[in-house]
């Protein structure tokens, strides 16, 4: 059993998620597709804009609408956030994410729904995660390379085949001699927008310092 979101490959020394996370993600299999889609929208919205008060209100509304215990729902969302963050950190492909969902006991249709939603929000999630990392960690190194999309590219649509994209790798200092690699895949307009946001954040930090 190989869980790709943990950075595992096909060797024999694969890490396994803890039982709590297995239970939290696996609980998604109890939802209808409509409920699952609604919950995923809530989770991805929070991961992108990170408004805790709004999330708590949405949890209460979802709990009341579908008769699900709020604490149970919070645990499910916590597990999903861990799963999606780790998937983005390890630059997981859509197929590998779908395979992980199946190993969490979601059926094929549910797994496809989760991976499709993840694909739709991948760029925004990655940008949000990198932005948060840059606010609390020193960047030790930055590497990038350009590529041209093909019809099989994970995060492109068929009408963007042949366009240029940029793969970005940041090496962050986590403290205590610990380093972390953060990966992103962006189109050029998205990269320039990301760069503009980082320059604005840098200017704000310099102002307050």
Curated annotation (Swiss-Prot):
Domain COMM span(s) in chain numbering: 138-209
GO terms for biological process, alphabetical: tumor necrosis factor-mediated signaling pathway
Database matches in Pfam families: COMM_domain (PF07258), COMM_HN (PF21672)
Molecular-function GO term, any one: NF-kappaB binding
InterPro entries for this protein: COMM (IPR017920), COMMD4/6/7/8 (IPR047155), COMMD7 (IPR037358)
Function: Scaffold protein in the commander complex that is essential for endosomal recycling of transmembrane cargos; the commander complex is composed of the CCC subcomplex and the retriever subcomplex.
Assigned protein family: Belongs to the COMM domain-containing protein 7 family.
Subunit structure: Component of the commander complex consisting of the CCC subcomplex and the retriever subcomplex. Component of the CCC subcomplex.
Protein name per its UniProtKB record: COMM domain-containing protein 7
Organism from which the protein derives: Dictyostelium discoideum (Social amoeba)
This protein's encoding gene: commd7
